Amino acid sequence: MAPIEIPRGQASYKKREGIITLTPDKTALIWSPLPGTGPPVISLSVSNITNLQQTPKTNPKVVLRVVEKPKAPGADPAAYPFQFTHATEARNEADAIKDLLSQIIAELRGDDPSLPKPAKSGPNGAGASAAMAMASAVNSKHLPFRWFEDDMLKADVELQQSLMKKDKALAHIYNDAKLSKPDSLSDASFNSQFWATRISLLRAYAIELNQKKGSYNVLSTIKPRTENGELKLNINHEQVQLIFQQHPLVKRIYNENVPKLTESEFWSRFFLSRLSKKLRGERITDNDNTDPLFDKYLEADNTMAVPAKITATSVPPIINIEGNEENQGGFRGGNLKDVEMRPRANIPIIKTLNSLSEKIMANVAPTDVDPSAASYSKDGIADALSKQLALQDLRGDAEAQLIRLSVKDTSTFFTGNQPSLTDQEAADARLYATQVPSDVLFEVQADMDTLDSDGRGGIDLHRSIGVDPDSDDEGNNSLDSKSGPKPQHVGSRAALRFAQNQILESMKSARSHLTTTTTHGGSHTTTTNASEERPMSLPTDIAHRATLTCATTAEFLKQFWTVFNNSSNSSPEKQQELAYLADSLVRSKQRIEALADEAEKRRQEIMEKRKREIREYYQKTGRKAKWVPVGGGRDAVWAAFEGVVGGLERAVAVWEMVKSGRI
């Protein structure tokens, strides 16, 4: 059976970047600093993890908090917050690691006979393990069915409070019932009785929280329209990503022809072409528009690089119908196929729709157990399947697996046999034993109160850190008179001036994002909150193209790093795919350069227009109008794509190292 790929992610711990993953045997969660190739700094045994907490999807920060059981009796449990820092896949990486940890912890608790089972819990709750499992599963992506059982739902207080926040009428009923309950009835018993009659509401709400919108046929939802003889097309970057995922052929055509064609021209021609009708599953007629760019791809394959979770899993040979057909040599129905199996005129349309349906369904999470994750017993039956088929109520109680303790030296357990202390340690112990804590604190407080009146002038805190506030030195206020560069101290003039300049630069940058300036004759007007219409003073169409270009570039970067991290560097298939993706990254940078050139061209046109307005105003009034700088242009585009360009250069540099054999 093919092993499950162990997830890993970029996560910071205590403001230090690193890599978090599980050991190959899935027994420990490890974190090691970047680049993640050294020994792990943090190693947490999965069996010692008592709780998993994750920030909700509405929070931009993705933090996974892992709680470990106390290492000593009476000690507090240790918590390890890991913040995932990947630019686009932080939430997916955190969900993957949390889902796998939740699955392993649930299996460990299900197989441990010393832990209470949810079915045997008391009437007031499902036990600590059930509450932990449910609390860790409320925000997970895929929940096992058993976490929707009655005991689990009644024990999950967080889910109940969330439901009452949504349903005000239910919250009002709960509060009134709680106020009118008898004093002899405990809060736990009241909660159990109250929610026992509303299990269906809890189950429906839990399922609603864990549902998400699936993929859909995006091409059928985009309809170009004509207004006043001009073609109108509304498409956003999310739709572009879906088109690239469902139709790799379109992504290949896009990568080969943009920036030769502009973004708007490419998509306008595509949605009017015959290829678009074919991919949507519509019949092509002789009256349809012909486009030499897209018509040559009508017979091209549209199934390249389609990821599939279902087809990637290994199927048991006993039910592998496709494999049996392969071995048996196909159909045995004579020379002529059945009438229903003969090709018809609409067969290409059916194949197109079936292919698209397979692509959409291929990445839908299955409701049953992943076959590749199941372990098999000696007779070939999956262990998980055999557990489901076994009649648990006919089995006897499992024998508790106790751990035998072997104690060799008991002398250290008694105070009379403690090892002897050194002379210095014994003297310190006697000194500390004779002191009274209240007297010591009083003496320290008295020394602090008399600092300014003891004749020594007190303590100059500025001088202790090397700062002279009376100095006229604007550079470094250090008391060190030696030549050479001096470090900036907290509170010095140089440090305050640096902080002031940094704040002013941030305000200036933020103001440039939120304001745009227009000139009417000799006057100019500053309009605030114009970032939605003209972000960074860029024209609306340029800003829209920049958004689409950024989204497609991020998609190419994501695919490059996914292929780079998930395969062997020496495999020929990976070398070929990495070469194709690296070429796509180079083309992406060319698209950004073309966009910057066009933005600069538009900026020059606006500047020429304003110069003409100023000259006309001078000719009419005889007064000179104030020149207002024009924003946008090449610098604005490069500033917006600064982080993206850095990622492109880093990825291309890594590919060059792979190509030269240094990685």
Swiss-Prot record:
Keywords attached to this entry: Nucleus, Repeat, Transcription, Transcription regulation
Entry coiled-coil feature ranges: none
Region annotated Disordered, chain positions: 452-491, 513-535
Keyword Protease listed: no
A GO CC term assigned to this protein in UniProt: transcription factor TFIIH core complex
Compositional bias annotation for Low complexity: 515-528
Known function: Component of the general transcription and DNA repair factor IIH (TFIIH) core complex, which is involved in general and transcription-coupled nucleotide excision repair (NER) of damaged DNA and, when complexed to TFIIK, in RNA transcription by RNA polymerase II. In NER, TFIIH acts by opening DNA around the lesion to allow the excision of the damaged oligonucleotide and its replacement by a new DNA fragment. In transcription, TFIIH has an essential role in transcription initiation.
Name under which the protein is recorded: General transcription and DNA repair factor IIH subunit tcf-29
Lineage: Eukaryota, Fungi, Dikarya, Ascomycota, Pezizomycotina
